[in-house]
Amino acid sequence: MVPKIIYQDDYLLVLDKPPGLVVDTAETVKQETLEDILKRDFNIQIVRGGIVHRLDKDTSGIILVAKTEKALENLQAQFKERITKKEYLALVHGLVTESGVVEGSIGRNPGNREKFIVLEEGKEAVTEYEPVERLQLTGERLQEIFPDFNKIQMRKLEKQRYGEFTLLRCKPKTGRTHQIRVHLKYINHPIVADEKYAGRKTYRLDKRWCPRMFLHAQKIGFEHPATGEWMELESSLPEDLKKVLNVLSS
């Protein structure tokens, strides 16, 4: 599971991370990680393999890696000072008609330490979002996806407005763990096929037609750590998520 190179020079490496690849090595992680690949295949021996920021295991897309300690310090400082610009594409439940901003501090869920929630005593978190396209699963397509459902079950889906979705462009202004996922759940528009935050029943329905969480790191902008030049790099939506959009109609 080797990531594609989007850009590289003597100071940095920008990769297109495939879904399913864990970023950081840890005792609890048994599979090969991006950190392992960077140290072995790219001979990057600095801390964390030079990884500047994280992406969740099932999130695909653009990730920034430093090749030197000095470049790592510079890029991490840009994240801390909010110079870096990031954009994600997320397919969410429900119809979102207007752009908005979610400002909600995020902390660990006291009832489940593996999850995060909006908490007054959490760390500051801000996410901007804007609708790209409103989409739906029509009656015929719902029948194709759920052929084993009877009329009562199908009516229940329609009553719950299950077939309504929006493709969002999300711009996190801070970098909290699970930030986009938590914020979209908080405004009642959870990401499609998000096992942690969509809810068990919804997740099971989503998995019938969406193979993984629909969250893709599409774009990143930053100052080059050596030249100071502003750079913007992009990752195309992967084939598995393109197929998901083809299932839906606008």
Indicate where each model-derived feature is located.
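RNA pseudouridine synthases
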Residues: 1-250
